[in-house]
Amino acid sequence: MNKKILSIILASAILCSSLVSCARSSGDGASDSTSKIEGGTTELGTQIEGAPLVSAAGAVDPTTIEFKGKDIYSDHSDGINISISDSADSRGAGYTVSGGKLTITSDGTYVISGKFSDGQIIVEAPKEADVRLVLAGVDIYCSYSAPILVKCADKVIVSLPEGSENSLEDKAESTLSDGTEITAALHSRESLSINGTGTLNIKAAKDGITSKDTLKITGGVINIEAKDDGIVGKDRVLIKDGKITVNAVGDGIKSTNSEDASLGYVYIEGGVFSITTDGDAIDAQTSMLISGGEFDIKTGGGSANVTSSGQMQGGGFFGRYPTGNQPTSSANTVSAKALKAGAYLDLTGGSFTIDSADDAIHTNDTVRINNGKYAISTGDDGVHADKKLEISGGAITIAKSYEGLEAQDIMISGGYMNITSSDDGINAAGGSDGNTGGDRMWQDRFNTTQNVSFVISGGEVYVNAQGDGIDSNGDLTISGGIVCVSGPTNSGNGYVDIGENGHGFYMNGGIYLGVGNSGMLVTPSTNSQQNSVTASVSGKAGSTLSVKGADGEELISFVVAKQYTTFTVSHPNIKIGDKITVYVDGEKQSEIECTSVSTGGSAGGMGGPGGMGAPGGMGGPGQKPSGVRPR
């Protein structure tokens, strides 16, 4: 049961040199995010003295993320007013305007307005300087470098006053005399903050905004068109608020530090985001935490740009691949995930609309979801974790996927999930991908001999799968919640599949209804703590299957997405000796007596067709199961 081959290209340039007068360590940069708040507060709590922002192998700790008072927009009435133009020639305290360049050489607040038809703003201040650039209506085009270039300072704040409209456009990358590559229209070698409520429009020949240290955004309307990446904070990206639109050939928002495991992460607590990319939408080299915000994301041309076998059809958002020419080597394969992290990916809030060619939510380690709303269409997996997937809350609707949820270890203790998949609905480290037409573009291959686990202890899970509904290469245990599965109509898969070599399907609590064909039937183990009944029943796609208990009360009702011939039901109120009654669209089909822990089952192993009836035809693609909660 080999799964998909992961093909990820990490293409990031690391600057190894800096100005001698502005040399700084990563430790200096880290202090920016952990300093005591000056003149402001945070909703995330008090700084813990000496606590790391991210452990070497851990998740982002929200209690250590803070925004200083100066990161938040404030009045600029005490600033130095500067008017720029191609012919301007002036000097003042801390600045010079000459030859189409504004050079800032001292700390302070500078209120800038005007236009350079081919020029730039340069910040080259002492390494301890805090420089605030208030863009009060600037229009800067630069053909030879970055329209705004921060060479040296301690920190630079770009403020966007209310009602201001500002534009930056560059034509090409450039290189400083020390070899430093300038890759963004707004490029900073130091910590950078952006705040305010005004507008900043960027048209970039490569990246839109780059900080080689920490990048913070607490406000502003930011619109970026980039030939490569939209927003890059090498050490970390911290976003509190703002309205951000990114259209990028590369990635949307990313943190890239791969040298220090405590850096390279993304934290977002609010804002409105519209991100369209050929690459990844939001990418953290290490970990990611999103606790709020509204996200509209499209990657790689969207899920429609991937065939059922997972191959790109070509003509992505920026036409990266010609039709029919899927890259076959990792060197040419582009990662087009919506949310991607190298370690932990924590989602504790927010609203997400995702249309991705690659995985919608992906990490090389652990995904944890405990809140938020997710509307997902993807050409690959809805949620993929190489190691652990933990879902304890939130509302997840996966309208289209290759596989809905996938990880080596899966733990579901809460939340609502409605999953539609062309292969397995939920897969714990295994299952056949049914891919006979060549490798899919993005494949995540699991070792089927690894120890895996799959436990559902709460929540509501509704699955409509063309492959296995729920597939575990180890044991499957349901001890709580509601689980309804519309399995495949073909005989090569089942509504449940478990691992070989003595693994079992254990019903220890909760409510379970599996519906499909009998070709690969797996029923709950006789070692289960809760009774189950398996029997034949025929119904067409879209019909309602309901089961009533011995007292005539309805135990479960489920609108089944595809034609079916077999069902398995388990409920705390089904006792040995009870008779359950089965209805299809309100018409009584049969009465079945529960005679054992697994009535009609096969001790949790693989069942044969054994008189269960022939499998039905294929249901329509893309139908979502709709579960009716037990009464």
Tell where the protein language model's regions lie, with residue ranges.
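N-terminal secretory signal peptides that target proteins for export/translocation
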Residues: 1-2
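A composition-driven surface/loop motif
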Residues: 5-631
